From Swiss-Prot:
GO CC aspect terms: plasma membrane; proton-transporting ATP synthase complex
UniProt cross-references to InterPro entries, sorted A to Z: ATP_synth_F1_ATPase_gsu, ATP_synth_F1_gsu, ATP_synth_F1_gsu_CS
Disulfide bonds: none
Keywords assigned by UniProt, alphabetized: ATP synthesis, Cell membrane, CF(1), Hydrogen ion transport, Ion transport, Membrane, Transport
Subcellular location: Cell membrane
Source organism (scientific name): Acidothermus cellulolyticus (strain ATCC 43068 / DSM 8971 / 11B)
Similarity section: Belongs to the ATPase gamma chain family.
Name of the featured protein: ATP synthase gamma chain
A Pfam entry, by short name: ATP-synt
Superkingdom as given in the UniProt entry: Bacteria
Amino acid sequence: MGAQLRIYRRRIRSVRATAKITRAMELIAASRIVKAQQRVVASTPYAEAITRAVSAVASQSNVDHPLLTERARPVRAAVLLVTSDRGLAGAYSANVLREGEALTEHLRERGLDVVHYIIGRKGLAYYRFRDRPVVRSWLGFSENPSYLQAKDVADALIAAFNTPADDGGVDEIHVVYTKFVSMLTQTPEARRILPLEVEETTEEPVGGMFPQYEFEPNAAGVLDALLPRYVEARIYNALLQGAASELAARRRACKAATDNAEELIRTYTRLANAARQAEITQEISEIVGGADALVATGSE
């Protein structure tokens, strides 16, 4: 019984140490998620506004900008996957990778060759384990991305888009990330960012008149300035959405792990108490048995 009791106590110490770690990670994620959520709220209007601005300029002009023009015979598509650098985030990265696999399959059904760009160690490990090629990866900033890091990603993707497909370039760029809906809800989402899909409408806007635009110096110059900013803003917003979603997922996962650890501690404590009680009972039985034996010996 003594050996069994030692095993239970050792397990209790081990689980309690793990619970301290998961509890600390839960508190860290909870403290960071507020700021991450604020950054998402702050960046989303800009990303949507610059998308509308680019769409308006494109629809009001006759400029065939290379970042807007659909390729006549697309050959290759790039897929950017936004995953996490660390674990203990539940199914956060797995959901993005699953959405990425579905998008890849859809693109291949269209006859396109698909190349992948990865953000986050989890996504990179997934592709390396399966011996799949990755054009480029970025690591170390999934929880706290900056605009400069988003610009670096955007520059690489724009360069690939501006390169002819025969020279290894791409004809389409898609991004797969996790959209932050609320603290409890985050959903994987795939979006095509290049070429930009210009939405034209015949519905009259509020006020009954369509806005008239004048471009200085010209429409092509405006698009040259806006389109790279549009790609950067979209990727930056995807990174921020992913960071907030990762922290929310980590908070939930660590809370569940802490709760499970506490339940396991209670279970092992009951088992240890039962083992200790059985040990004491056995010791008492041995003492009583020994006393009875002495009494019996003395009476003889």
